[in-house]
Amino acid sequence: MASCLALRMALLLVSGVLAPAVLTDDVPQEPVPTLWNEPAELPSGEGPVESTSPGREPVDTGPPAPTVAPGPEDSTAQERLDQGGGSLGPGAIAAIVIAALLATCVVLALVVVALRKFSAS
């Protein structure tokens, strides 16, 4: 009976360690983001591009038209969560792996306690 319990716990331990590794293996790699202060790349053969028209100030047209503020029930309708295609970031993956390792340690401690209890009686 104890060997069957130990075999089950070992199988649970192995599956707890391997499941996060298998599930996080197929995450696509995202391109490296550029820094905000890096200069923009210019097309080959062209000089710097002027971003503003010389000598012209924007004309003030007055205050903007008032808009209807959304009610409290409409505040979440405009927000779109997780538009990145459903992939997890590196922090979330690390948290999942750490949680799996902690769960494995708890299961291992329970196995040790159970084996000591049954071997003592």
Curated annotation (Swiss-Prot):
User: Is Acyltransferase given among the entry's keywords?
Assistant: no
What keywords are annotated for this sequence in UniProt? Cytoplasm, Extracellular matrix, Membrane, Secreted, Signal, Transmembrane, Transmembrane helix
Paired cysteines (S-S): none
Signal peptide limits:
1-24
Please give the subunit comment from the record: Interacts (via the extracellular domain) with FGF2.
* One GO process term, biological-process aspect: cartilage development
Family annotation (Pfam families): DUF4690
Q: What is the protein name stated in its UniProt record?
A: Protein SNORC
Ranges in the Cytoplasmic compartment? 114-121
Q: Where is this region: Disordered?
A: 28-84
